[in-house]
Amino acid sequence: MSSDFKTASQEKVFEIMAPVGTVAFAKAELKQWMKPVDVVVPKAFRESGHTAKVYREPYGVTLVIGPFNGPLTLLFDPAVQVIAAGNPCILKLSEGLPATSKLLLDLVPKYFDPRAVTAVSGSREEVTELLKLPFDFIFFTGSVKVGKIVMEAAAKNLTPVLLELGGQNPAFVDPTANIPDAAKKIVWGATAWGGQWCTSPGYAYVHESVAEKFVEECKKAVVELYGTDPKKKFDDYSRIVSPKAVERLASLIDQKKVVAGGASDPQARYIDPTIIYPVTWDDPIMEDEIFGPLLPILTYKDFDAAIREVKKHPKPLSGFLFSRDQKAIDHFLASLSFGGGAINQVNIHLFIETMPFGGVGNSGIGHYYGKAGFDALTHAKSVLISPPDVAIEHLFPPYTNEKVQALSQWFEY
């Protein structure tokens, strides 16, 4: 991973220990997840001895397409869910990670029966051909643009999909927030993993009364986290996946608005943790998901108006609010649609197995993690069980008024 781009010590923990934790949780809970579930039937059915159960059955051969930004976590977490649900899977490795992909191509056949798990590599052409195959399920993690291509290809075979995409994720800071705490967490969230995580705060949206203080605390946080020369913090600060990606990020920076950082070195795949202020919705950096360690800071006067502004844009994968005001928290949760998120925290909801993870709208379709993932990757087969010697006579013609009246009781629970 280090030779591809992952370098921070904490990322090694998240990349390795997170999938291991997923395995342990699935092993502990799987028997319970697999059990048929009894469901209530209408009163008339109960009185005649009928019962009903929902059984879970695997969809079948599943294609898991992994992204570059989570070489292990975002490949093996879905794979664990797929396998736990009883589906054989094909792992499509990221072409952006040559060293990691080469290693996995060696290790997967060593430790897995190829009838259960197979790893393949390839670029766009190979993926295009792969998507023509009639898979039983496709699990894709990546960009909205490619997600639409995957969904279009899946539709030709009526293949169900789970799409984990992304978006420009807001981090609100209201006047009641603990400003130093909010600044440090948001700066970390925007720069951890080089900002190359789908759940990273895409921008801070700060009440104007605390904006200047927040900016100063963000500048302090950059130094506290990465020192005065982050480029030397090779163990604590990730590089970017490619020189081209660095150039794209650098083009988004308005140097006149940089209050911290701003430097880049494409050949070293490096860009500073960068704070940009003041930013407006018209700035180019706000047009799309940033996917890098840049933190634009916008200000608002009215919380309702700020939420309405966010709602004009595609639904984000994550949403964050820093506040001590419970009414503001309740309003945020009730008014803004997003995949998942946190209050007074960022990013780490991603690693909690008991919380279904997934997007909404442009940020994704479907959820995984824990029981939610097991359910998403299995078909719910509903079965009504009748005693062998019981007939519901009013079901059969000729239909008298008495039979029609009896049939109407089918809808009473």
Model-assigned labels for residue ranges:
Residues Y270-Y413:
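Conserved C-terminal structural/oligomerization subdomain of aldehyde/semialdehyde dehydrogenase
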Residues I65, S123, T141, G189, ...:
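Conserved residues at the C-terminal ends of beta-strands
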Residues M1-T51:
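N-terminal Rossmann-like NAD(P)+-binding subdomain of aldehyde/semialdehyde dehydrogenases
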Residues F112, V146-W281, I343, K403-Q405, ...:
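ALDH superfamily catalytic-core signature
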Residues P42-D181, Y300:
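Rossmann-like NAD(P) dinucleotide-binding subdomain of oxidoreductase/dehydrogenase enzymes
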Residues M1, S101-L104, V108, L130, ...:
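Hydrophobic packing residues within well-ordered alpha-helices of enzyme cores
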Residues K132, L165-G166, W197-T199, K233-F234, ...:
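Short glycine-enriched loop/turn motifs at secondary-structure junctions
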Residues V23, G86, V117, I138, ...:
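Residue-level signal for inorganic ion chemistry
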